[in-house]
Amino acid sequence: MSEDFYDVLGVSRDATEDEIMQAYRDQVSEYHPDVSDDPDAEEKFKKIQKAKDVLTDEETRQQYDQLGHERFEEAEKRGATGNGGGGAGGMGGAGGPFGGGMGGGAGGGMGDIFEQFFGGAGGGGGRGRSGPEQGRDLRTDLTVTLSEAYRGVSKQVTVRRPESCADCGGSGYPEDADVRTCPQCDGQGVVTQVRQTPLGRVQQRQECSRCGGEGELHSETCSTCGGQGQTRERATLTVDIPEGIRTGQTLRMDGEGAPGEPGAPNGDLLVDVTVEEHPDFERDGDDLHHRHAVSFPQAVFGAEIEVPTLDGAATFDLDAGTQSGETFRLKGKGMPRLRRRGNGDLYVTVQVVTPESLSDEQRDALEQFAEAGGEEIDVEQGFFEKLKNSF
């Protein structure tokens, strides 16, 4: 039974990526075959490398935690884990005529089978690498106010991301380290394996696991990055928020993700945007909704009403006899349409406010108003209470 990856590195199951990388560096400095006298150093180093690769990849680590060590290794042999390429689907998958682990995934077919037999690095259904690997994408969150989403704004975000190691220039070893030809691949960077298949004996070329395809070994690794060529650093970047951005939308910053392998581009930084709620406006797509209080006389006689917008005050005509709850539309006073021309609308719902207290003169006037309309006034309740209870 092989050893659990967390135990290999000596970390807890809830260890952070930084803790895992630190444990990896400590183990590498002790068991790297080029610096260790331990006769089992090479085998231990492979285990350490494998444990680090699995536990520092978010998707693969999640699969590992869900499956457990033994089931994960079985799935990996079949090519069913996150970085292993195709799974059990397609021709030659689990239960297929060519046995487990050779499927190209759903939609694989004969091309994947012959690629597995005759070319490509790695096994278990994966495709061979055609060149340096692009850096992975990173994600971060950013919150903006509704006013900032209305006008557009430039904001700064700080992210922790891999950077090329400043001490070794990304090579993974010091400049003065001794160099020798890798004995496992004779300096070729690849090794050839002969396999017996249903089609006969075939040769498969794989990237050398000892030197990582470089064909050379170095007497020591960089103490700063543990031989990885990368360190995690904080980077402060400026994000341009376009007018009309909405919650849940994502902005892509090209080339601001993790660095790629030498000769390959960096990944991208994906910024997930959240727009804060506003105390005066409720957003509905590109439209805004606002509740506005008007007085009883304004509702009765009509008036020019001033309301706030995200671009300053605006006015509209309140019709005489307006009832509480009626809505008025102010065209073009809503949010800008993202990467399109024009704005949405502002919908103002009026709320007729009943005064909480009246002077004697105001009370007499309202009672006369009611009597003129033929309404009977309950002396005990009074017109004001009657009016207030009618809303």
From Swiss-Prot:
The J domain is necessary and sufficient to stimulate DnaK ATPase activity. Zinc center 1 plays an important role in the autonomous, DnaK-independent chaperone activity of DnaJ. Zinc center 2 is essential for interaction with DnaK and for DnaJ activity. It comes from Halobacterium salinarum (strain ATCC 700922 / JCM 11081 / NRC-1). CXXCXGXG motif repeats lie at residues 165-172, 182-189, 208-215, 222-229. It is found in: Cytoplasm. Residues 81-94, 119-129 have a biased composition (Gly residues). Belongs to the DnaJ family. Zn(2+) 2 binds at residues 182, 185, 208, 211. Transmembrane segments: none annotated. Homodimer. A zinc finger (CR-type) spans 152-234. GO terms for cellular component: cytoplasm. One of its GO terms (molecular function) is zinc ion binding. InterPro entries: DnaJ, DnaJ_C, DnaJ_domain, HSP40/DnaJ_pept-bd, HSP_DnaJ_Cys-rich_dom, HSP_DnaJ_Cys-rich_dom_sf, J_dom_sf. Residues 4-68 form the J domain. HAMAP family: DnaJ (MF_01152). The keyword Zinc applies. The gene is dnaJ. Residues 53-94, 117-136 are annotated as: Disordered. Zn(2+) 1 binds at residues 165, 168, 222, 225. Its main location: cytoplasm. This is Chaperone protein DnaJ. Residues 53-79 have a biased composition (Basic and acidic residues). Participates actively in the response to hyperosmotic and heat shock by preventing the aggregation of stress-denatured proteins and by disaggregating proteins, also in an autonomous, DnaK-independent fashion. Unfolded proteins bind initially to DnaJ; upon interaction with the DnaJ-bound protein, DnaK hydrolyzes its bound ATP, resulting in the formation of a stable complex. GrpE releases ADP from DnaK; ATP binding to DnaK triggers the release of the substrate protein, thus completing the reaction cycle.
